[in-house]
Amino acid sequence: MIDTTVRPQTRRGGATAAAALFGVSGLLFLLYPAVRPYSDYLNETTLDGARAYASGGWVAAHVFGMLGFVLLGLAMQALRDVLRGTPADRIGIAATVVTWVGVGLTLPYYGAEDFALHSVAIRALGDGSPDLLDLVVQVRGGGTQMTMFASGLVLVAAGAVTAAVAIWRSGVLARWSGIPLAVGFALFVPQFFGPPWVRVAHGVVLAAGALWLAAELLRPRRDAADAR
């Protein structure tokens, strides 16, 4: 007969890893909009836009975003260890799988926007001509890449919502502790249509949600009754 019980030290180790990964991921999602230059807003095919794309801040900000997504996927895997053997076991697996698929679909767009636009902008500034910046629209707005990007972000949001449901049903974490992070990722697509301050505020929401969940994961494990 297979032993399906989960050793306390295994759950504690998973909780510590998940807390660290969620915490760092949340901070990276805050740095992403905070460091990003915004001179390209309403000026994406002008030299003002090129100055944003060519800056070190542009590259760093998008790298922060990409690392945030990777760490989010790893955090979901570690959270699954915490939920193993609870009523939310299968839901935790679903959250991990959906999140990773979403991350996989999202990252190619971030890579293109980061490195391709950076290279195009450096060349445009060197030539003193904005003509090359017509490529910005092609890099950003093609049907295939936009579909992958939007689908990826929707799946990441679905993964975060599924994780919140798993946490609610698990009995080992405070029921509400996954909801703020789920709300943050549900707002990931809409925040792109807001002004810079909205994007920075969204980063604050994501960081707060991730740190809240991290703090809950570091609390001593409780039984189902106490976790409510």
Where are these regions (language model features)?
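Hydrophobic, aromatic-enriched alpha-helical segments typical of multi-pass transmembrane helices
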Residues: 2-228
